[in-house]
Each structure stands twice: as C-alpha cells, then as structure tokens.
Amino acid sequence: MNPTELISTGGLNAVWVSVGYRLSVFGFLAGEALRDESHGKEVGNYGLWDQRLALEWVSENIAAFGGDPHNITLAGRSAGAYAVQAQALYDFQKADAPKDLFRRLMMHSNSIPTQPKSPEDCQPQFDEVCQYFGIPSEYSGQEKMRKLRQISAQDLTDAIMNLDHHTFRPVTDGVFIHPGIFDFYRNGEFAAEFKRRDLRLYIGEVLNEDTLYAITNGPEASLDSLKLQLTNYYPPSTTARLLQHYSLPTSTDKKDWQDIFGRIVADGQVRAPYRFLVNNLLSHGVDIQNVWRYCIAYRLSFITEKVAPASMGVSHSMDRPLWK
C-alpha cells in the first residue's frame, strides 16, 4: 500500500512502515530436513519471523521518527491479513511476548481459515522442489539443504509455477503457530486477550473476491486438478471436507472448474474465516464498537475493461486505491 495521498492530501498524521519479508519458497518452505536442521524447533515460518523482528524494531525505534510506540496499527491485505492474524495469535499465546506491540488490527480480504498444514503435510512440496532441481531423494536432509542453497534465487523463483505444489504458506510448527489454534478461539481465550489489551479490529472484503481467485492458479477441468489446487491452500483432510459442501461441475469446460475453485477459495480464505473471527470476538464479549466490518461493492471508474473485464466485478485487491 502507498499512503502518499492519505498523508499528503488526506491529512493522515502517521508514520507508515512497510515491512519487507521473505516470501514463497524463501519464507515458507517446510519439511523434515528443515525440522532436523533446527533441532526440532522453528521450521517453515521464516517470513513470519521476519515480520516479528520488524514489529519489535518498530516498537523500539519508531519514536525516533516521530511515531508513538503505544499507538501502532498492524495492517495487511490478502496474505498480509493472514499474517496480521498470525502475529496476533503468536502474541496472545506467548507468555513472554511484549504486550504493547500494536493497538489495532486491519485485515483486508483474508483470515486464517483452518489449522495450517504441519511440516509433515508439506513434505511432498519439499520433495518436489528437490526433484525439480535434480537433487537425489536418497541424499540426507543436510545434503539436500546444501544443494538447495547452491541454487540461485532467480532459478528458485522461476521454478515455482512449474511445480504442482506451488503455493508456500505458513505451517503449524509448534513454535510460531501452535496446534489447536481454533480451540484457543472457541474457549474464549483469544477474545479475552483481545479485550484485555483493549484492541480494535477493522476487517472486510470486496464483493466479488472469487473472480480473481478463479483465474489465479485455477484447475484444469477435472476433479483431480481441483483437489491438487485446493491442497496448495489446505491440508488434504480439509480439502476433502470442503468438497463435500459444493456442487461440482459435470462439464469439461475449464471455466466451470475455475469458477468453483474461485468460489471455494474465496469462501475459505475470506468470507467464512473472517465472519468466524468477528462472531467469535462478539460472542465472547468484545464490544461491537471495537469491531468494524466493511464490504466494498463499488468498482472505481478508472478500473476499465483494459485493466480488468467488467465480468470480474469488484474483485480481490481492486479496493487497493481506496486505502491510499
């Protein structure tokens, strides 16, 4: 996000910090070799740890730039919104975590929908990366990591979309993301900590989240392809349960399969989890004045047919200019 207009013409009195962190294979590769390398500790969530370091740096140093370390808003869109929630969970569940790193959470078009995959769930992805680069399967984990680190960043980046398992996401490592996070919601502990810290949440979506998801890494016209693309997002058991709740296409038209993929992912990544989060907070006593929801249904006039077909409506990320 670019806050130039908010600050220069909108009168926003704020110091804006954009956090750079490791993405994709660099930030979220997980598997047995990485678990062994860390001696059973942190694995897979390197991008989240980068964010964490940045949060702590801002808290410690923002006053030198005219900011208020006790008045920080943590914000993100899409995967960034997912990360905002992950950072809050980490903070709430770690007894020795600083208690005042942020006062507000802004989550645009994403939320945590289910318990993230375990490193074991991600092993096929790790193995596929090794196979793609010709690293023998009989190599030890240490040898595999040594070979992977010899590959250039550009070659790794170029390989990603040639993989079946091309989406690298946070994992349940037991250190940053703990097992049973939804028990933490259901028993009221998340809401209790939210209230204790007197936090605020601003969260929402755009009207047609599904239309961009449908054409981004969408499936071919088959059930197997649909399952494969969904397992890039969710553990196999979650994918199986999801598919029980949707009427699947019977045609061989690729667009039909892309459309159902877009709907499932938009429901799973945005609509259902953020409603669950809001409902959980309110049902456990968080004041409704501290939870703000929105839905943007207005398509900006400069988003012309050249930019995106009108049939996409107000799709994922089309609200970005509104926050500038």
Predicted segments, located by residue:
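Cap/lid segment of the alpha/beta-hydrolase catalytic domain
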Residues: 1-52, 60-64
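Active-site rim elements
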Residues: 40-45, 111-117, 181, 255-268, ...
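Substrate-access "cap/lid" subdomains that shape
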Residues: 53, 60, 64, 71, ...
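Conserved alpha/beta-hydrolase "nucleophile elbow" surrounding the catalytic nucleophile
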Residues: 77-78
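Short glycine-enriched nucleophile-adjacent loop
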Residues: 81-96
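Catalytic lobes of large eukaryotic enzymes
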Residues: 226-252, 311-323
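Alpha/beta-hydrolase fold catalytic core
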Residues: 235-285, 292-298
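Mobile gating loops/cap/lid regions near enzyme active sites that modulate substrate access
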Residues: 275, 279-324
